[in-house]
């Protein structure tokens, strides 16, 4: 069974969409299920009337990238590069709301956004 607790959430309010990483206890590290969920969220945002997509983390970290332990456990390839490309190609303007530390692949994800801004934690 797939653990859906802590999957990234999507909220669309008016013309602003927000994807929020929900794993502050592990520095918002992303696993394969998270990547799939974010891809679905990006498809939803691209099909919506949103003009802005904000990506943010919860807690004191923005994102620490992909959970490489999932690769060691025999899981399929991460797909992280495809996620970064999807963010770069996203129709709305993308903003990384950096609420704290950005590590590993989280740096690539932030750089894939059109803008990066520091926000209070």
Enumerate the predicted regions with their spans.
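Phosphate-coordinating loops and pocket residues in cytosolic domains that bind phosphorylated ligands
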Residues: 29-32, 73, 112
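Histidine-centered beta-alpha loop that forms part of the nucleotide-sugar donor binding/catalytic region
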Residues: 22, 66, 99
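Hydrophobic/aromatic residues within transmembrane alpha-helices
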Residues: 19, 55, 67, 109-111
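Glycine- (often His-adjacent) and acidic-residue-rich active-site loop
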Residues: 36, 57-89, 102
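Glycine-rich beta-to-alpha active-site loop
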Residues: 87-121
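Conserved CoA-thioester-binding segment of acyl-CoA-metabolizing enzymes
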Residues: 1-58
């Amino acid at each position: 069974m797939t653990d859906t607790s802590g999957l990234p959430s999507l909220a669309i309010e008016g013309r602003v969409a927000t994807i929020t990483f929900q794993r502050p206890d592990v520095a918002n590290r992303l696993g394969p299920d998270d990547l799939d969920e974010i891809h679905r969220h990006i498809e939803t945002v691209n099909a919506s009337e949103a003009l802005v997509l904000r990506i943010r983390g919860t807690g004191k970290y923005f994102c620490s990238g992909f959970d490489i332990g999932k690769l060691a456990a025999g899981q399929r390839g991460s797909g992280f590069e495809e996620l970064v490309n999807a963010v770069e190609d996203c129709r709305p303007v993308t903003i990384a709301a950096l609420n704290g530390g950005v590590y590993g692949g989280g740096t690539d994800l932030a750089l894939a956004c059109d803008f990066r801004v520091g926000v209070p934690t």
